[in-house]
Amino acid sequence: MPGKELTDPCVDCADAEAILTVRCRRLCQDCYARFVNFKVFKRMENYRLRRNMSRTGPCKLLLPLSYGTSSSVLLHILNAQIQHERAKSHPSPGFELHVLVIEPSTVSTSSPPHDEGFDLLQQTFPSHSFTRVSLHNVFELDPSIQDVLSQFSSEGFTDDATMSDKDRLDAFRASITTATSRVDVDYILITRLVVAFAKKIECRGVVWGDSDTRLAAKTLANVAKGRGSAITWQVCDGMSPFGLEFSFPLRDLYKAEVQNYASFFPELAKIIIPDEPPSENILTKNLSIDELMMRYVQTQGEKYPGIMANVTRTASKLQASLVPANVPRCSFCGGSMLNQDGQIIMGGAAGNSEVRQGAELCYACTRSRPEVSY
């Protein structure tokens, strides 16, 4: 008996109705999910096969999860790949995941606590280890941050060690007045928290859930903020200044493609906190550079996805310059204190004579200080 005739067959399998157009190709749900999985599979191949690393012993990777779509989808995909590998009679050495959840309500006051989300994560992905922390736990995991706060902050801010860690961090963040500086500082704090935790549990690297769209926006924002040198580790796969490998397995997927994948799996809907739609009434001057670049990439990416993808591809070709071991690092962000001529620079050389004595801040961190406005 002949099969049912399809009105819009999938171009890959031709056995099911196509439901989505993926880069000019009509695919069914299964083929679409396979397309997304393969993009991530290629990026994790080195860890799966343990290329250029020991094939014995654990290979632990840390996955920071924000309950956002991208990091949740990355966990879902990597979990499926790990389970598939373990089911083989002769599996590859592979890797193991530890998931770090930074409670979103401690990062943004507009984000509600998501206790049920953490419980659902553990129930949905029982084969992995999970840890939940607050942003102010950076004091506990990275004690050196305490010395940096007074150096970085404005003259009117005094760090009170007798206060609770939460109150100390809230007071420090409240002293930062511009939107761009607040976002910049929060990103640095989150990175330092993630790095400190990864080192504590002896991870080899960190896998970030940044899509191509996010990486393109980050590239443009970093250049605008004077952090162009950080692109080699904030956008590119490879070694970071912290002695950990940074990887971005979703770098070949647009944000819309990641969102489509998430819609296929009901278990993710209860975990993911949806993004707030951008407000049309907010003034541009009240947006951070990061928010402006994300809006730009998202709107232009809908019209010209190939052009936006080229931003990330071009950035991924950048190579970090060889920095001598004795070159000082920025005490806040960890970047090297070298200018384009290879000369050591200090924060004061960036044009701000009010940097406190003893502070070793790079040019970009000097610009983010409360006394300096973008």
Curated annotation (Swiss-Prot):
Keyword Plastid listed? The answer is no
Q: Which GO terms describe its cellular component?
A: cytosol
Q: What lineage does the source organism belong to?
A: Eukaryota, Fungi, Dikarya, Ascomycota, Pezizomycotina
Presence of the UniProt keyword tRNA processing in the record:
yes
Write out the GO biological process terms: protein urmylation; tRNA thio-modification; tRNA wobble position uridine thiolation; tRNA wobble uridine modification
What is the protein's species of origin? Aspergillus clavatus (strain ATCC 1007 / CBS 513.65 / DSM 816 / NCTC 3887 / NRRL 1 / QM 1276 / 107)
Q: What is this protein called?
A: Cytoplasmic tRNA 2-thiolation protein 2
Any one GO MF annotation of this record = sulfurtransferase activity
Compartments where found: Cytoplasm
Family according to the record = Belongs to the CTU2/NCS2 family.
Report the coiled-coil segments. none
